[in-house]
């Protein structure tokens, strides 16, 4: 199965060679993330694509000095909504009605249910929920990159508050939750490149309830 072949090929690159990834491949990776499913279809996050080398240099010290931050072609920053608001929820429901060209009573009832639920919750709880949705898109981007023959490095080891400040995310009602350098592996410097992939066995990972 081609999908499994690609997933076996990919790994978290520990060194990148600085080679640029084509804009076409980057666009495909971002499109896969855009098409990823999210709870209630709200897509409560944004993807910041950092191409500017100076910005990457600024982020590296607050990301455990990991070389992939500066040696990648593009750095994707997945930033979740800091909370759910009526405006944000309504915007997505209105967009759905506009694209589909009609209003559905059940859909509008669902809108009211969300409006009576999410905005009243604690902002931190809402952010944590939004971040989970960002991770779904993050995973789609990783898989799409593998299909494009492009390497990625999932990074949670960074100071979110510092990254938020560098990119001005808090002013936009966003908080960074995960980073994804995209580029090509440096086979001479990457200690992980030739090591076997290690995963739990299916038996240890999966429980089937008949």
Question: In which residue ranges do the predicted regions lie?
Answer:
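Acidic, surface-exposed loops and disordered segments
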Residues: 1-210
């Amino acid at each position: 199965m081609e999908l499994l072949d690609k997933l076996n090929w990919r790994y978290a690159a520990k060194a990148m060679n600085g080679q640029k990834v084509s804009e076409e491949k980057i666009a495909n990776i971002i499109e896969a993330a855009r098409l990823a499913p999210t709870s209630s279809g709200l897509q409560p996050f944004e993807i910041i694509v950092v191409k500017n080398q100076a910005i990457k240099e600024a982020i590296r010290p607050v990301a455990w000095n990991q070389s992939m931050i500066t040696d990648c072609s593009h750095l994707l920053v997945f930033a979740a909504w800091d909370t759910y608001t009526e405006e944000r929820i309504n915007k997505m429901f209105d967009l759905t009605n506009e694209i589909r060209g009609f209003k559905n009573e059940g859909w509008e009832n669902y809108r009211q249910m969300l409006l009576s639920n999410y905005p009243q919750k604690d902002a931190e709880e809402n952010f944590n929920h939004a971040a989970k949705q960002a991770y779904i898109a993050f995973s789609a981007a990783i898989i799409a990159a593998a299909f494009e023959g492009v390497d990625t490095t999932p990074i949670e080891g960074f100071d979110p508050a510092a990254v938020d400040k560098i990119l001005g995310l808090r002013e936009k009602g966003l908080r960074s939750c995960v980073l994804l350098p995209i580029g090509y592996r440096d086979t001479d410097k990457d200690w992980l490149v030739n090591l076997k992939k290690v995963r739990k066995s299916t038996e240890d990972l999966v429980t089937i309830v008949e």
